């Protein structure tokens, strides 16, 4: 039986040292039994592979009519979204015969040269824009970037693709950040894998010495964490 996209992505996260199990304190103050470090995708091989995973998820979503095929550009919020947008656009072209643009924003507006807030494929009225980002905690980056996109042109945001959905309640709602963004903006938010899929996949994996990758303690703490904070 072929491994699922989520299972293969979990293997990739582990091989890239982007997924760690242990004791971590998040920005929210929550004590988490796992941590995802997007900064681990720090060379050409890893970022190319990551882009291919995003492209595969996008292709699946197109087949299921979750997002349209006629995407004009992939947009990544600065700074972490920049390599995601570029590598995803390359992978869509190389592996899925889709030629799409890539666009990202500047943190500060440029008043000389090409100028403006945006870099890459220019945004024009009527364009279909697909957002890409790594892990959503509260949806802050999305809420900041949507007004910038709309100020640039009357574009249609057709969706957002994340690497991992943490599936956690936000501080002021029982909704997850993903569901809150979907409800607020009306476009689908997809992920290559969600945290439950990651733990299910990791629970079946073994270390090189044959011992389980996830200790019984980590599995118990993961279950307790999702029981308390899961949405």
UniProtKB/Swiss-Prot annotation:
- Fetch the HAMAP family from UniProt: PyrE
The top EC class, named as a word, is transferase
Upper lineage ranks?
Bacteria, Bacillati, Actinomycetota, Actinomycetes, Bifidobacteriales
EC number of this enzyme: 2.4.2.10
Which reaction(s) does its UniProt entry say it catalyses? orotidine 5'-phosphate + diphosphate = orotate + 5-phospho-alpha-D-ribose 1-diphosphate
Tell me the pathway.
Pyrimidine metabolism; UMP biosynthesis via de novo pathway; UMP from orotate: step 1/2
A cellular component term from Gene Ontology for this protein is: cytoplasm
Q: Coiled-coil regions in this chain?
A: none
SUPFAM superfamilies in alphabetical order: PRTase-like (SSF53271)
What is known about what this protein does? Catalyzes the transfer of a ribosyl phosphate group from 5-phosphoribose 1-diphosphate to orotate, leading to the formation of orotidine monophosphate (OMP).
The keyword Magnesium is assigned to this record: yes
GO MF annotation terms: magnesium ion binding; orotate phosphoribosyltransferase activity
Q: Which UniProt keywords apply?
A: Glycosyltransferase, Magnesium, Pyrimidine biosynthesis, Transferase
Matching entries from PROSITE patterns are given as: PUR_PYR_PR_TRANSFER
Subunit and partners:
Homodimer.
One GO biological process this protein is involved in is: 'de novo' UMP biosynthetic process
The protein's name is: Orotate phosphoribosyltransferase
* Entry's family note: Belongs to the purine/pyrimidine phosphoribosyltransferase family. PyrE subfamily.
Residues that coordinate or bind 5-phospho-alpha-D-ribose 1-diphosphate: 27, 79-80, 106-107, 110, 112, 133-141
Superkingdom of the organism of origin: Bacteria
- Cofactor(s) needed by this chain: Mg(2+)
């Amino acid at each position: 039986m072929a491994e699922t996209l989520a299972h293969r992505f979990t293997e990739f996260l582990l091989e890239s040292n982007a997924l760690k199990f242990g004791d971590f304190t998040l920005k929210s103050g929550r004590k988490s039994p796992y941590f995802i470090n997007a900064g681990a995708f720090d060379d050409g091989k890893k970022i190319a592979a990551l882009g291919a995973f995003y492209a595969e998820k996008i292709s699946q979503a197109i087949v299921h009519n979750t997002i349209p095929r006629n995407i004009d550009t992939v947009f990544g919020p600065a700074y972490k979204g920049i390599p995601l947008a570029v590598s995803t656009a390359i992978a869509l072209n190389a592996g899925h015969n889709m030629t799409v643009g890539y666009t990202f924003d500047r943190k500060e507006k440029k008043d000389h040269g090409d100028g403006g807030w945006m870099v890459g494929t220019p945004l024009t009225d009527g364009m279909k824009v697909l957002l890409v980002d790594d892990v959503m905690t509260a949806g802050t980056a999305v809420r900041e970037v949507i007004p910038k996109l709309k100020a640039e042109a009357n574009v249609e945001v057709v969706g957002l693709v994340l690497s991992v959905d943490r599936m956690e309640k936000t501080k002021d709602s029982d909704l997850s950040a993903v569901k809150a963004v979907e409800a607020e903006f009306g476009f689908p938010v997809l992920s290559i894998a969600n945290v439950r899929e990651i733990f299910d996949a990791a629970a079946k994996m073994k270390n090189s010495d044959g011992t389980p990758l996830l200790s019984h303690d980590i599995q118990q703490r993961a279950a307790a964490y999702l029981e308390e904070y899961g949405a």
